[in-house]
Amino acid sequence: TKVDMLLTPKSISLKEVMVRPDPLRQMGDTLSHHLAAFLGKGDVTLEDGLKRLPGVDVSKSGSISYMGKAISQFNIEGLDLLGGKYSLATRNIPADYVTNVEIVRNHHSRKIDKELPSNEVSMNIKLSQKAKFKPFGQEEVGAGYMKDGEDGLQALLGATGMMFTDRLQTIGSLKGGNYKNFAQVDMIDHFGGSGISTPATNLFGGFDGGAPPQGEYLYQRNGMATLNTICKVDSNTTFKVNADYSYHRATHDIEQSTTYLSGDGSYITVGETTSPLSTVHLPKLSINYLRNASKAYLNEKFVLKGVF
């Protein structure tokens, strides 16, 4: 028996389905956070997003800690571009350019030590495709007027650019102005080692008069320039160059007075006011060749820095 069937097309609209990745994934010692799941309204930079992650704390200076322990390494796509100057990345990479933030517990900076116990914590930033293979950045422009201070007009002008590929990463920044101490904040090394040492200070430890914390009481004119590049030679080898320069010109007032009781019962007050001016230039160049394999480790580093 022959049967002929005539079929007619019909469209059926399906309900919209949205697939979202898990906000948290555990893979051994690595805890991966899908950053978009934690972002809130008004979160613009990577640093804004990091403050939302459970267990992660970002201090006012920009240093990052996890469960109360400061991170010992900050990587972008597995590469240590900035060392302790990672605020340059966290405060300039847009939050929506990051897919995942990985926190690695029991971290080993040297692969040859992987069998040894460790309590170090590191962080690795995974970027979205729109952040790769093309340059991007942001500009900063600000102006205002302050009644008190050396300069009535306060201004800040700067630009930061970066590019990330599979084998090459670059971040550069240039800023100048007379508003607060932005150059010191942006160039801070959260892992230490940013100070200038001499044979005398290495031997005797230097002298500290207990200067007050720097803030608005300093009328600043400062600027900074930095260029950081790392090249991935192979899976175990990198070549990195970091060049920094910062300039600070600051004035502040110091007042002190001493009151004496004279023999006739009267009081004599002696006062002193000092308004010192300091200008500091801080250049630094670091070149690093790193071979970090499971059976071999070589870390050759050349550092040239000064203050004048």
Annotated model-derived regions:
Residues D22-F308:
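Membrane-proximal, glycine/serine-rich, low-complexity loop/turn segments characteristic
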